[in-house]
From Swiss-Prot:
Protein name, as recorded: Protein NATD1
Homology family: Belongs to the NATD1 family.
Entry-linked Pfam families: Acetyltransf_CG (PF14542)
Boundaries of every N-acetyltransferase domain copy: 19-109
InterPro entries, per database record: Acyl_CoA_acyltransferase, Gcn5-rel_NAT, GNAT_YJDJ
PROSITE patterns listed in its UniProt record: GNAT_YJDJ
Source organism per UniProt: Danio rerio
Amino acid sequence: MAQAAQINVLDISTRLRVEHDKKRRQFSIRLNGSHDKAVLLYEYVGKKTVDLQHTEVPEAYRGREIAKHLAKAAMDFVVEEDLKAHLTCWYIQKFVKENPHPQYLERILH
């Protein structure tokens, strides 16, 4: 039975789709077709500056790199929109440290 759950976990991670709600200023992933969702919240703190504030993944889904998909989507948004970013969220700080792409690094405000 545990093996079946493991297969299901792998299936979830291969079908993740990040949605961006610009009005609510959040990126989200619906998890396993349920009402559960992982979110990354941000705020505009200037005309071309965002603060990537918080990432949250429901406890039952942690450790499956779901937050990594949210962080990548958020940083890609910063690049595509030619924004600058404050990284208040510790997870996004970790993501950028582990993925030090020049297009990310040049947009981070310290």
